[in-house]
UniProtKB/Swiss-Prot annotation:
Function: Tubulin is the major constituent of microtubules, a cylinder consisting of laterally associated linear protofilaments composed of alpha- and beta-tubulin heterodimers. Microtubules grow by the addition of GTP-tubulin dimers to the microtubule end, where a stabilizing cap forms. Below the cap, tubulin dimers are in GDP-bound state, owing to GTPase activity of alpha-tubulin.
Keyword Nucleotide-binding in annotation: yes
Spans through the membrane: none
Quaternary context: Dimer of alpha and beta chains. A typical microtubule is a hollow water-filled tube with an outer diameter of 25 nm and an inner diameter of 15 nM. Alpha-beta heterodimers associate head-to-tail to form protofilaments running lengthwise along the microtubule wall with the beta-tubulin subunit facing the microtubule plus end conferring a structural polarity. Microtubules usually have 13 protofilaments but different protofilament numbers can be found in some organisms and specialized cells.
InterPro entries (UniProt xref): Beta_tubulin (IPR002453), Tub_FtsZ_C (IPR008280), Tubulin/FtsZ-like_C (IPR037103), Tubulin/FtsZ_2-layer-sand-dom (IPR018316), Tubulin_C (IPR023123)
Any one cellular-component term (Gene Ontology): microtubule
Official protein name in the record: Tubulin beta chain
A molecular-function term among this protein's GO annotations: structural constituent of cytoskeleton
Amino acid sequence: FAPLTSRGSQQYRALTVSELTQQMFDAKNMMAACDPRHGRYLTVAAIFRGRMSMKEVDEQMLNVQNKNSSYFVEWIPNNVKTAVCDIPPRGLKMSATFIGNSTAIQELFKRISEQFTAMFRRKAFLHWYTGEGMDEMEFTEAESNMNDLVSEYQQYQDATAEEEGEFDEEEGDEEAA
């Protein structure tokens, strides 16, 4: 969400679409403890609220994509969507909300997995769950699912448009056989 400032200070600053866009993509403003500069965006949605030019919003979003093209996967066309609602949020002249699916989230999943593994190895707190009817195997399965998710995000981060073309050809060969 942008602007990330106190409501009281809002009346003294006039925000621009450019500043909102910059704040949205700023690593310090992310709600998850991962740095998007360590990954690539698969998809992005940005919702702007307030009186502003749709043209300016589109230009700013395109500008971010062009300046930071290495942080966006090229094999998903039109992977950035924007919307503008001309009714501003209460107490603000304009705001923006950002939702991004970035491969950088694997950092967070890896940390959680490491912490889980350390606790599970010691069987810490496990009795509370098994006492309620859960099986130890469910935890092992959840750990495996988490590791699969991390691997999948890593593949998406490393993938290129050329590789996807090769994959399509392989699929066609399998169907022909």
